[in-house]
Amino acid sequence: MRPAQTNQFDYVKIGLASPERIRQWGERTLPNGQVVGEVTKPETINYRTLKPEMDGLFCERIFGPAKDWECHCGKYKRVRHRGIVCERCGVEVTESRVRRHRMGYIKLAAPVAHVWYLKGIPSYISILLDMPLRDVEQIVYFNSYVVLSPGNAETLTYKQLLSEDQWLEIEDQIYSEDSQLQGVEVGIGAEALLRLLADINLEQEAESLREEIGSAKGQKRAKLIKRLRVIDNFIATGSKPEWMVMTVIPVIPPDLRPMVQLDGGRFATSDLNDLYRRVINRNNRLARLQEILAPEIIVRNEKRMLQEAVDALIDNGRRGRTVVGANNRPLKSLSDIIEGKQGRFRQNLLGKRVDYSGRSVIVVGPKLKIHQCGLPREMAIELFQPFVINRLIRSGMVNNIKAAKKLISRNDPSVWDVLEEVIEGHPVMLNRAPTLHRLGIQAFEPILVEGRAIQLHPLVCPAFNADFDGDQMAVHVPLSLESQAEARLLMLASNNILSPATGRPIITPSQDMVLGAYYLTAENPGATKGAGKYFASLDDVIMAFQQEQIDLHAYIYVRFDGEVESDQPDTDPLEVTNNDDGSRTVLYKYRRVREDAQGNLISQYVRTTPGRVIYNKAIQEALAS
């Protein structure tokens, strides 16, 4: 049993993290007082023992044990040692799933700028510093120096960019014997950026910007407002500008960037491990160069390479050359994992796969009722499997779940009969993405069909904005009796005839249906085959048409003693004939009537076409059913 989740939360807030906060995420103090959490080695696992290397990217001391209830050295095994920290290897005896959420960190030997805030659009670092992005990049990537403090030098201004030669010239002046220059400070790289950002007093800056905006106009005013908005956001969230330059970077849990052994003994690893390894290697090399007091040019080059390695880790390809793997494939950075359709948010958090659902291509089902849909058999047996198993056990056909599953997997004929019983009266919900209004999900009664495509009634297509050119739809099964009742009463397609947006009918015939109705009821005086024939009933007309004795549009007379409505009143007789038996035959424009001497109707023949008879019969049958 897993412990119940007690720490409920309302929302997730994304913001800048301070170096102290990043250390807090990964740092833990062991019972012996040792502080762990910093990843210092680029190694992942020992290829001989296949165990994680200590202080490496998969370190068990930092991230937790690789096996449940077992320390690294093997001194403690089994759940009875729960919570003990091994005094030999320093690994806590706990579940291995802690490796999915325990983090580490890398302490950088030199600060690096966060590429999102440097190269994003807009670039927040350049907005805050009120410098062009090109100049900020020149500083970060060690191409230009920047004046941090002009001192008493008249030729220098705060934030002025200097080339290598200009700085060497000024340096010579500073260190010459008769120099008058004092307090001149010049920096390069992210360290200089850190200093510039730390020097910004947000409240004062916001105050002066508000005063400036009052008198500014046009482009300058828009620029000032943009800068003020960024500064106000920093003040509101309690973030500091210098946090956009990182001195500590977090290492995500190892089980989120796994390393798995393949059949041939080789290992497949997440791209993040390669990117982290590059950062650690360059960071360690830089620390060593600083220790041995290496020449400035070498240290600067190493700092630039560290900046590029961290850029690639956070957002590969955002700036400079894209880091590629073994087969010239760009490595997936943290940004690539988060963003886009296949990213963590859209793929895993917003759109999850759910049980009792399926999806398939839709095809037209012209023989379906409006509240029905055709559900493929193999899909239905999977969706309704628990109900089928329950029915099989209750009916005594099998004794347990295992036997029922075996029966289903064998496609036993009795299973299909049970499935028919189960789905009777059990609505399913069909959804077509994108669900733009409530009619994007509707309930239908499933009808089992052969094949692998879902059959949909053509009249409900406008509500789903569906067509049959390869569209796919998802099926969901409501499980509880309450949800089934709700689906039947509120969501059934036959209950959703009017659009909730406009109040107009959304179920309207279109395309083939309109064309078919028009063709059946159209008049064509040129159709002469069988024209003028008399028929005793509507069925006789259809039979004659099927035997090809009459054309679909030929004018015929069919006996129909009921009331006849027409567009124009048909009351003026064209011809009246008196018969020998006292009755009379009256010929109107659209009918022929025989009456007795008192004017009572004996028989009536209506002029129509076989097409109209077929149309009439189809509507009558639909209404009757």
From Swiss-Prot:
InterPro entries: DNA-dir_RpoC1_gamma (IPR012755), DNA-dir_RpoC_beta_prime (IPR045867), RNA_pol_asu (IPR000722), RNA_pol_N (IPR006592), RNA_pol_Rpb1_1 (IPR007080), RNA_pol_Rpb1_3 (IPR007066), RNA_pol_Rpb1_3_sf (IPR042102), RNA_pol_Rpb1_clamp_domain (IPR044893)
Taxonomic lineage of the native organism: Bacteria, Bacillati, Cyanobacteriota, Cyanophyceae, Nostocales
Cofactor: Mg(2+); Zn(2+)
Protein name per its UniProtKB record: DNA-directed RNA polymerase subunit gamma
Function: DNA-dependent RNA polymerase catalyzes the transcription of DNA into RNA using the four ribonucleoside triphosphates as substrates.
Keyword Transferase recorded: yes
Residues the record lists as binding Zn(2+): C71, C73, C86, C89
Record flagged with keyword Nucleotidyltransferase: yes
Molecular functions (GO terms): DNA binding; DNA-directed RNA polymerase activity; magnesium ion binding; zinc ion binding
Catalytic activity: RNA(n) + a ribonucleoside 5'-triphosphate = RNA(n+1) + diphosphate
E.C. designation(s): 2.7.7.6
Annotated residues for binding of Mg(2+): D467, D469, D471
BP term (GO), one: DNA-templated transcription
SUPFAM superfamilies attached to this UniProt entry: beta and beta-prime subunits of DNA dependent RNA-polymerase (SSF64484)
